[in-house]
Structure formats: structure tokens, C-alpha cells
């Protein structure tokens, strides 16, 4: 990609980049971060170039389970946490259109848990207390793995435990042990990405590739891709998941979903001072205007979409596993297509009144 090549050249020429001896990594670039300047450009942004090729569908069974889940959340958590949950049923309905009513309900609950966990982790007081932050991380992993532990260890999170325990007990009952372990592993990777994102400072901007690689995990897309198998009641063998073309497809699908979230969250994240948005990073690494940075990311998304379509048109044959491989690819395209449709329409990402 020409845009990416230019970014990497810019990074290589930036004298403020420093490499630790013996370590294959670079420190974030220290550069001026003018929050007011970014805020001033929000009103002129044009998102009309955002488009999506991947279709999904709509799972009508979610309509029955979503209100009950939202009601339970409202009874256990603050209004600040629950205010953005009203539309979450539409996200799951679009990403997992073929899931049975029973499995769709579990996926909905897991997704709600993920949103609640995100809100808890974003608490400013928690992020400044590393011990408390790590404690919450450990609790979340224990809940996702459905481990046995004394709830007395977490008096401040009784409502989170009360809400989450039944979800992963049900998930464990329906999913294979392998699928459960894979989900727990991807969720642990996701939490590490969240921790990295929380460590960023406005005057320490990571390079574009580092940010993109981490955001493949921060967006929890690998978790959703495991849930896509669960929704279709399939388990993709390692011979398929380990195939280089399939691995490339998964990576590109993560990138597209991250680009979409960054696009539709852009205004909110700029207001919140978030610097890990790839559009913001593109702007801070040399784009003259925020609109230029947005257009670059949308162009990269378009090219990534073309690469995905090329892979799906030329998938290798997997013998007896060929049917499940193709269903897996179809399931992942539903996830990214449904995410785009939801992000572009949900009130969660609209301008505040």
C-alpha cells in the first residue's frame, strides 16, 4: 500500500524514534498533540466514502432475548454503563444471523459482558491504580474460563460476578472444551491489548503498524471469530485455521473491523482524548488535515476489502474439511459486515446532543 509505505518511510526518518539495544521494538514517537486543533476539525468531517461490500443478515430471535438481558443489566449496573446497551441486540443480530435462539442468547450475553468490562476498565480511577487494574483483569479471566474461586475475594464486583457466572456456565455447557479454551485465550490477548492502549499518553504516539497490530486484539475480533464458530455449531480444525491463506484472511478481517470502529468512533474518541485510533495516529504522523487521515484509512479499508475478496475467491481445498472451512469464512464475513452495518447506524456512535 502506497499510503502505508509513506507512513513507514516517515517513521524511519523520524529522529525522535529510538530503539532499545537488544530489543526489536521502538519507543512511541514524542510529538505535539493539539487536542483543540483536532476538536476544531470535527464539524467539517465527511464520512460519505465509508462503504462495505460484505453482507450479513439479521437474527430475529435476538428480539426476544435482548430486552430481558438489558433489564438485568439495568438492575445491576449504573446508568453510565447501561445507557449504550439498548441497541446492542442489533449488533449481535447482524453479526450472527444464523445462530439458534439458545446460542444467540449466549452470544448476546457474552457481548454485553464485554461492553460492561470495557466500561469498567476505562474508569479513570482504576487505570491509575495498577493493582486494582490487575485484580479486575484476573477476575475477568476467571469468569471467562468459568473457574472456581471464592467470590469473597472480589466484594466490589459482586454484581459483575452475579451477571457473568451464568453466562459462561451456559457457554461451557454448549461449547466444546477446545472452543472454550480458545475463547479464553483470545480474551486474555484482548485484555493485554486493552492494557497497552490504556498506557498510551497523548504526547507518545505509537507508530501506525504497532497500533494496527495491537488493535487486532483490542477490538476483540478474535473473540468474536471464535463465537462465529459457536454460532454455526462448527469447530474449525487446526488444519484449516493454520492454513496461511486462512490466517491472512483472519488478519485482514480484524483490520477491516478495526478500521470501521475507528471511523465511526472517531468523533467520540477525539472528544475523549483517545490517541490509539488509527485515523488520529495517521493525522499525527503527517496528514495535513484530519479529513486526509480519514480518507487514507478508508482507502486502506477498501484495499483490504479487495484482498479479502481475492482470498475468498481462491481458497484452497481442504478435503473432508472443505465444507466447514467455507462456512467459517462465510461466518467471519457476516461478523465484519454486520459490525459495519451496526456501527454506521447505532446511536452509540452518534454525536451527543
Swiss-Prot record:
Q: Which Gene3D superfamilies match?
A: Farnesyl Diphosphate Synthase
Q: Which UniProt keywords apply?
A: Lyase, Magnesium, Metal-binding
Motif NSE motif, residue range(s) on this chain = 261-269
Motif D(D/E)XX(D/E) motif extends across 118-122
Q: Which SUPFAM superfamilies match?
A: Terpenoid synthases (SSF48576)
Instruction: List the EC numbers from the record.
Output: 4.2.3.-
Quick one: a GO biological-process term for this protein?
Answer: terpene biosynthetic process
* UniProt motif (WxxxxxRY motif) ranges: 342-349
Where does the record place the site Plays a critical role in the stabilization of intermediate cation? Answer: 115
- Signal peptide residues are none
Q: Which InterPro entries match?
A: Isoprenoid_synthase_dom_sf, Terpene_cyclase-like_2
Binding-site list for Mg(2+) 1: 118
Q: Where does Mg(2+) 2 bind?
A: 118
Q: Which EC class does it fall in?
A: lyase
The entry marks the following residues as binding Mg(2+) 3, namely 261, 269
Write down the required cofactor(s). Mg(2+)
Q: Say yes or no: keyword Thylakoid present.
A: no
Q: Name one GO molecular function term.
A: metal ion binding
**Family of this protein:** Belongs to the terpene synthase family.
Q: Which PANTHER family match?
A: BETA-PINACENE SYNTHASE-RELATED, TERPENE SYNTHASE
Share the domain note from the entry.
Answer: The 2 conserved active-site motifs D(D/E)XX(D/E) and NSE are required for coordinating the divalent metal ions that stabilize the PPi moiety of the substrate. The C-terminal WxxxxxRY motif is frequently found in terpene synthases and is important to guide product formation.
Task: Give the protein name, as stated in the record.
Answer: Terpene synthase 3
Native organism: Physarum polycephalum (Slime mold)
